[in-house]
Amino acid sequence: MITPIKNKKKIEIIFDNGKVIRKGPLLIKFHEFNDDENEYGISVPKRHFKSAVIRNKIKRQFREIINKQTLMRRGVSFFIIYNSPEKTLFAKLKGLTESLFKKRVDTTS
């Protein structure tokens, strides 16, 4: 099961030592830990979306996409940053996110 990151040290490790992949408006930073938990974080910058309603909607959409991921490798924690001033349709977000997961986060190498 994938849960939100609660540990501040893990977030710091992800941002300092993690690998980065980009595609379109998405940036995913991830790091492999030696535990069996998969954890995630989501960031939608306030400078792009002033309205909290829109930021929360985008975060809910990402949570829905992440919770439906079933093939994720154990021990991978990641942080998704949505870095675009335009809103994107859910289907496009889902496609971008899944392609990035297949590209790097899901791979077993």
Feature map (PLM): residue ranges:
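Positively charged, solvent-exposed patches that mediate nucleic-acid binding
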Residues: 1-109
